[in-house]
Curated annotation (Swiss-Prot):
It catalyses: GTP + H2O = GDP + phosphate + H(+). GO terms for molecular function: GTP binding; GTPase activity; translation elongation factor activity. Mg(2+) binds at T26. Its main location: cytoplasm. Residues 83-86 are annotated as: G3. Residues 179-181 are annotated as: G5. The lineage of its organism: Bacteria, Pseudomonadati, Spirochaetota, Spirochaetia, Leptospirales. This is Elongation factor Tu.
Length: 401
């Protein structure tokens, strides 16, 4: 059967459900697909709860993660939605960036309020750079009708405070209360399907369209460098974001002092191009740059858009023995290699105060100092390796210097 063509006419957004276990994340995911299929139609298909719950395990950077991917659309947008069955899957998913989220729907049970994983997921969202959160207060049908408004208001205030604490704008965040179960059962009431439409309306209006990857400033990690006699030095790699045109000025950033050059030629598959864009594997001919002035692990970037750093804080997941990770814990001042984009750089781990060691399977916030600076900004993913094998995965949460 011929595959259906992906419709690019609508803006696309990656979204996911986050929140405490049993607060109704998976039920809400099923309710969204079901409600949109019934009331909006189009290409929307209702996906049953157990189809989402029996999420297939997939490997991302060697780590096994169970995630379910659904798609749906509103009149304005196309959404790819990720839902994880287990808490550990969420942690791994957010840190490895297996499913990059442009926004998250935080599901909170109106009967319980904030629980430990509610906080943990908000913190993770902040650390890994999820830019927007919309809140769905679920299970509102379980509250007595005469107390419902007061209880919902109370939970709302509590969640607002939590969002503010982790630098999300709690007072601007949309809150929708309802019952994902009632919506899933097809009940067309304020708590049922109408609450789902309200939720999607809030996501449509509150979350802006993400910047397309080609509209971001040019960046290309250098994979290889060679010189062509009589022409100069060529740096090869895959364009990560943005567009590169001939005669563009670029900076070479990372490992050494930042230098500038001009791109005098762009080649792809031995053909000359006028420009290259995100996703292209290219060779860029650099004017006046010697082969020994540039190396793998640096990046070519639009001037002034990225800076090199050695010290940063990171959110890290340490692989278990079964995932091919370490069999034993590691301690403060552990010195592994950090694999950024195309190269390994040695660095030192400083564990948070009071923490003696990190066990395989742990998720931890740590400070890292590299021996050479690397071009980085918040949200950059990396692997932690020992002798070439991956023992952890991390994301830059904050740059220190």
């Amino acid at each position: 059967m011929a595959k259906e063509k992906f419709d690019r006419s609508k803006p696309h957004l990656n979204i996911g459900t986050i929140g405490h276990v049993d607060h109704g994340k998976t039920t809400l995911t099923a309710a969204i697909t079901t409600t949109l299929a019934k009331l909006v139609g189009g290409k929307n298909k209702a996906i049953a709860y157990d189809q989402i719950d029996n999420a297939p395990e997939e490997k991302a950077r060697g780590i096994t993660i169970a995630t379910s991917h659904q798609e749906y659309e509103t009149p304005n947008r196309h959404y790819a939605h990720v839902d994880c069955p287990g808490h550990a899957d969420y942690v791994k998913n957010m840190i490895t960036g297996a499913a990059q989220m442009d926004a998250a729907i935080l599901v909170v049970s109106a009967t319980d309020g904030a629980m430990p994983q509610t906080k943990e997921h908000i913190l993770l969202a902040r650390q890994v750079g999820v830019p927007y959160i919309v809140v769905y207060l679920n299970k509102a049908d379980m509250l007595a009708a005469d107390e419902r408004d007061d209880m919902v208001e109370m939970v709302k205030e509590e969640i607002k405070d939590l969002l503010n604490k982790y630098n999300f704008p709690g007072d601007k965040t949309p809150f929708i209360s309802g019952s994902a179960l009632k919506a899933l059962e097809g009940e067309d009431s304020d708590l049922g399907m109408k609450s789902i439409l309200k939720l999607m309306e809030a996501v449509d209006t509150y979350v802006p369209n993400p910047t397309r990857i080609v509209d971001k400033p040019f960046l290309m990690p250098v994979e290889d460098v060679f010189s062509i006699t009589g022409r100069g030095t060529v740096a090869t790699g895959r364009v990560e974001q943005g567009v590169l045109k001939i005669n563009d000025e670029i900076e070479i950033v990372g490992i050494r002092d930042t230098t500038k050059s001009v791109v005098t030629g762009i080649e792809m598959f031995r053909k000359l191009l006028d420009q290259a864009e995100a996703g292209d594997n290219i060779g860029a001919l650099l004017r006046g740059t010697k082969k020994e002035d540039i190396e793998r692990g640096q990046v070519l970037a639009k001037p002034g858009t990225i800076t090199p750093h050695r010290k940063f804080k990171a959110e890290v997941y340490v692989l278990t023995k079964d995932e091919g990770g370490r069999h034993t814990p590691f301690f403060n001042n552990y010195r592994p290699q950090f694999y950024f984009r195309t190269t390994d750089i040695t660095g030192v781990c400083n564990l948070p105060g009071g923490m003696e060691m990190v066990m395989p399977g742990d998720n931890v916030t740590m400070s890292i100092e590299l021996i050479h600076p690397i071009a980085m900004d918040q949200g950059l993913k990396f692997a932690i390796r020992e002798g070439g094998r991956t023992i952890g995965s991390g994301v830059v949460a904050e740059i220190v210097e």
